[in-house]
Amino acid sequence: MPKISGQTQLLGVIGDPIEHTLSPAMHNAALEYLGLNYVYVPFWVKPQQLGVAIAGLEALNVVGFNVTIPHKETILPYLADVSDLAQQVGAVNTVYRSEKGWVGTNTDVHGFLAPLRQQSCLWSEIAVLVLGYGGAARAVVTACYDLGCRQIYISGRQRERLGAFVASWPQITLHPLLWSERATCLAKISLVVNTTPIGMSPHTGATPLTAEDLAKLPATAIVYDLIYKPRPTLLLQLAMARGLQTFDGLAMLLHQGAAALEYWLGQPAPTAIMATALETALGTEK
């Protein structure tokens, strides 16, 4: 942590709640490693205070900030510009300054793709099942579309919300499945992505797919759970027991954060330092 002075530059993250964010740990480790007089702090911003908070961050000369739940979509009207990618996703998670004012972009797509790009898959032959239809699912759909995946299935509990989610992607053919139908396509699925909070601490005994469900997947399938606490989730434990390749959400958190830092600083982020900081922060959380 740098010695705070009148020259210290400010970065941060806004959300509600915000007390459990791991972003300060990885960003401050990176800033210290780079020898920069910056500090990254969390800001608890309630939805009804979002507009005031954005104006305040600008007035205080904050260099840039991340955006987390529940502001990723509602922040859009408060920005001077939004990147094409963020418009496609419909959500912003990173904001930086320009001559016009605040510019919003989305590094969640990059973060999600980082571990997948290391796989030797023929993505045009891959069918994907996305569990959930929230903001994280939007980033996942965009990423899978960019990869060129053959089919994308979306499963959720509420028929109306599921239909609205599918209708919001006129350029992409999505296949909706009600939650009770989510296991019906597994025999042809090569990538399963859980974007729901099912299995997240403290509800660690829950899983969106059972061992019986996972047994229907091809032996080469990948199971990707965006949750990173606990590690591993019950879903990933069951997938590993089945011999499937797995990823958790820590890689996504790391790489979206590294991409955000590069927007703010204009230089490569020390991802190895950030990864170590994340592992340490997770290990010391009670």
Curated annotation (Swiss-Prot):
Residues at the active site: K72 (proton acceptor)
Annotated organism of origin: Thermosynechococcus vestitus (strain NIES-2133 / IAM M-273 / BP-1)
Keywords assigned by UniProt, alphabetized: Amino-acid biosynthesis, Aromatic amino acid biosynthesis, NADP, Oxidoreductase
Pathway: Metabolic intermediate biosynthesis; chorismate biosynthesis; chorismate from D-erythrose 4-phosphate and phosphoenolpyruvate: step 4/7
Catalytic activity, EC: 1.1.1.25
Function: Involved in the biosynthesis of the chorismate, which leads to the biosynthesis of aromatic amino acids. Catalyzes the reversible NADPH linked reduction of 3-dehydroshikimate (DHSA) to yield shikimate (SA).
Residues reported to bind NADP(+): D84, G132, Y133, G134, G135, A136, L226, G249
The protein, known as: Shikimate dehydrogenase (NADP(+))
Gene Ontology BP, a term: chorismate biosynthetic process
Family: Belongs to the shikimate dehydrogenase family.
Upper lineage: Bacteria, Bacillati, Cyanobacteriota, Cyanophyceae, Acaryochloridales
Record flagged with keyword Amino-acid biosynthesis: yes
One term of GO molecular function: NADP binding
Catalytic reaction list: shikimate + NADP(+) = 3-dehydroshikimate + NADPH + H(+)
Keyword Signal included in the entry's annotation: no
GO cellular component: cytosol
Signal sequence, renumbered to the chain: none
Quaternary structure (record): Homodimer.
Enzyme class: oxidoreductase
Positions that bind shikimate: T21, L22, S23, T68, N93, D108, Y228
